[in-house]
A protein has these predicted regions:
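Gly/charged, well-structured mid-domain segments that form the phosphate/adenylate-handling core
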Residues: 139, 174-210, 214
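Cys/His-rich short segments
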Residues: 78-141, 145, 158
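Residue-level detection of beta-strand-connecting loop/turn positions
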Residues: 32, 148-152, 206
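Extended interfacial segments that mediate partner engagement and assembly in macromolecular machines
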Residues: 141, 149-152, 156-163, 169
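A conserved, hydrophobic alpha-helical segment in the catalytic core
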Residues: 13-22, 112-126, 159-190
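Flexible active-site lid/hinge loop adjacent to a nucleotide/diphosphate
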Residues: 3-110
Length: 226
């Protein structure tokens, strides 16, 4: 669901699960600052109080929603670093609670990672569904280890880049919230295909071209890293 439409439709659709992946400076001409988008998502969640909300523990903005809604909440995220140092692009350098500068125990990408505020104590929550290891990061996909509650498993992911590993964790978190067999859900991750314009591969003569969608500075950083 489009982040701008969630507040309009969630009360009517009455979803069982709402997944919020991350917040970046995306389409500022439509939504303004990321805090405006966050408020819109919060309103959408409040309109569906029976929905279980799956939040990205690595995103300080997304994770903050847990304290603002009465819904049952589950977290997903990466328990392993993906970048040695802080990225040059950060949409959330300061604490959403007190305004202090975040520090990080490790970084995944952009402003995502093991954040904590030394001033007020707001910090990354422990995820219910966690990536505990990255066995392989390939141009065409990856292999990762997951902890889903008490269950440990490994899965192949057919889409490349770290952010798709995070998306896989989100999918497994949602599957668990819906009461689906998580191991069976993990087996399907290797069969996911790219959507139109998102890591789509097109034949160009004797070569292949990959289309990488870029909508914000963080996405551009990931595209250049790829």
């Amino acid at each position: 669901c489009d982040e701008g439409a969630l507040r309009q439709v969630s009360g009517r659709l009455r979803p069982a699960v709402i997944v919020v992946t991350n917040l970046f400076r995306d389409q500022l001409d439509r939504y303004g600052e990321v805090t405006h988008t966050l408020e819109s998502i919060r309103a959408g969640i409040l309109a569906a109080p029976e929905a279980t909300v799956c939040l990205n523990a690595d995103c300080s903005l997304t994770a903050s929603l847990a304290g603002d809604v009465p819904n049952p909440v589950r977290f997903f995220g990466l328990n392993v670093p993906c970048e040695a140092t802080a990225a040059g692009v950060s949409d959330a350098p300061r604490c959403i609670r007190c305004g202090g500068a975040y520090q990080y125990r490790y970084h995944t990408y952009a402003h995502l990672g093991g954040f904590y505020c030394p001033h007020c104590g707001y910090a990354r929550p422990e995820p219910d569904t966690a990536v505990t290891g990255l066995t392989a990061l390939r141009p065409d996909g990856s292999t990762a280890r997951f902890r889903c509650g008490d269950d440990e498993l490994s899965a192949d992911i057919s889409l490349p880049s770290v952010y798709n590993v995070c998306n896989a964790a989100a999918a497994l978190c949602a599957a668990g919230a819906l009461g689906l067999p998580v191991r069976r859900a993990a087996e399907t991750l290797g069969g996911v295909r790219a959507g139109f314009g998102r890591m789509e591969v097109l034949p160009v003569g004797r070569h292949e071209a990959r289309i990488i969608l870029v909508k914000n500075p963080a996405g551009c950083d990931r595209a250049l890293d790829y």
